[in-house]
């Protein structure tokens, strides 16, 4: 290695020997210096060695049918929403490619997406899976934690910081990522008329989100929190970031009914009401979102609206068993690591699905239900070497008995609960 400074007392790179006057930047470490050129060379060598690829080749974005097919590996049902998302995402990244090559004088505008569907219907999972398919940075934010600048709460710029962190602070990659904002219906204003008083967690948040949804160069504090004078800020262009917002929008079906001038007479079964609500939900238009409490400018920046249906019993059973990362497969694998086979009786899966529907948690609540059933099993099995199989029966799923354990000699015993 070279000395830290030459005869004239100038600092120099410990690797290539260039002085600080010969390079753009010299970074100091404990007893060592490295120049920007050597840093760049090191990065190239590491990328070559590890085979690090770019996040996504925008010239080869998967076709809508391919995107929907991959989504179906992880998300059960919701075909209408998957189609809408596949088309919107394909067009979004095709637009980025078109605007970057500048072959056409027509500049394509951005199509952010609004997902409307009940809790646990798969809104977040769809957004996460899209990001995984495209291998782009992804961040999730909760709209209820946001407030407009100057008030106690989280600034909207902190959403962008999460995306930058997801891209390992590579701003260029973050600028082509996906941000999912959940619970967007919770920032609807209380009435469709503009508010006279400040609504800092409702209409104020919508106003604050407008610029980043449309596309602007935002200044983001690198450590999060509020901006301070003399603080170095990260500049990020949001023009190519795809924003997906989601919410349950409870009660929007009634708004659609009123718009269509339809009245429901009499009392139907729960199933009939569910089907009826889903029919109206699929007919949501921007005018209905305005009535619900989103401001016109905000709705204008969400041109793609996709609706998701409430998951029924059959769909929840499929979610438990069919996807690549299905919960039943995960728990089977966990017990497999202890050399124990796990079996769920078909009727037990139906009971788990019924419980999720009763709790009104949809697919989101399935894991907590299984955790509750499996608690004693997962506590006991690691300490035993005579168990070969665990059976979850219908009664065990209902909480009426403990799961059954099969021993090496083939005998079946109930698990003993410990205090």
Curated annotation (Swiss-Prot):
One Gene Ontology term of the molecular function aspect: ATP-dependent protein folding chaperone
A GO cellular component annotation in the UniProt record: HslUV protease complex
Signal peptide span: none
UniProt: Zn(2+) binding residues: 13, 16, 35, 38
InterPro entries with a match to the protein in the record: AAA+_ATPase, ATP-dep_Clp_protease_ClpX, ATPase_AAA_core, Clp_ATPase_C, Clp_protease_ATP-bd_su_ClpX, ClpX_bact, P-loop_NTPase, Znf_CppX_C4
Pfam family for this entry, one: AAA_2
Domain of life (superkingdom): Bacteria
NCBIfam families named among the record's database cross-references: clpX, PRK05342.1
The protein, known as: ATP-dependent Clp protease ATP-binding subunit ClpX
